[in-house]
């Protein structure tokens, strides 16, 4: 397998940002984000938090939250976000770290409630859900989708791709689709996109090291 770094590509633009969400059951004993880590501090290791598998983005989000609030949850890995959410619905774990779109339907039914999202601002469709930053926790983590080209791509080709992507990102049909899927329309130009890649690379490198994960 070829190793690939963000430095090996030329960023064109980021199209969205899909932050981590922290949902628990609708009948869970904690009502706010502050209640959740407090329960773990009271009984270390008792609070079971599901994730989508070792080294996955939602596992890293889970670990980043632990690091920021100074608690240790009992991590329960699953083979993806969907089985983690099913385990939460079944009462087998106390909370999960997943994307908002994976729990939106269960939130509207009242089966689950989302305590917070790891984003810079509140999400469309989740307007009542606070961000971690609103709660004094400086953490914004999730996944994103964007356009990049091979590093040796000629500048004139990059210019064409940049303009086409900018126009496409401004189309109502794309914005509506991302909002409908709770996937957070968040266009960013090439410079901002590269900064995001660089920041995430460093954050994830540190988390992977702390977790002792190896390829």
List each model region and its residues:
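Glycine-/small-residue-rich active-site loops that bind phosphorylated ligands and cofactors
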Residues: 28, 57, 153-154, 185
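An extracytoplasmic/periplasmic, membrane-proximal ligand-sensing/linker region
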Residues: 67-71, 155-215
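Soluble non-cytosolic domains of exported or imported proteins
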Residues: 56, 82, 90, 97, ...
């Amino acid at each position: 397998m070829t190793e690939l770094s963000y430095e090996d590509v030329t960023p064109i633009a980021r199209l969205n940002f899909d932050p981590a969400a922290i949902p628990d059951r609708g009948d869970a004993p904690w009502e706010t984000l502050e209640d959740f880590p407090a329960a773990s501090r009271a009984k270390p290791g008792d609070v079971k938090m599901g994730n989508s598998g070792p080294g996955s983005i939602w596992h890293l989000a889970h670990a980043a939250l632990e690091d920021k609030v100074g608690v240790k949850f009992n991590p329960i890995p699953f083979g993806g976000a969907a089985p983690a959410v099913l385990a939460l619905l079944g009462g087998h774990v106390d909370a999960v770290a997943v994307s908002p779109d994976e729990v939106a339907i269960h939130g509207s039914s009242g089966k689950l409630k989302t305590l917070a999202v790891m984003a810079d601002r509140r999400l469309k469709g989740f307007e009542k859900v606070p961000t971690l930053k609103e709660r004094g926790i400086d953490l914004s983590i999730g996944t994103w989708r964007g356009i990049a080209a091979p590093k040796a791509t000629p500048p004139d080709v990059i210019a064409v791709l940049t303009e086409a992507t900018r126009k496409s990102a401004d189309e109502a049909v794309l914005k509506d689709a991302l909002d409908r899927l709770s996937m957070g329309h968040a266009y960013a130009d090439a410079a901002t996109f590269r900064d995001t890649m660089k920041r995430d690379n460093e954050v994830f490198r540190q988390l992977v090291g702390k977790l002792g994960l190896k390829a």
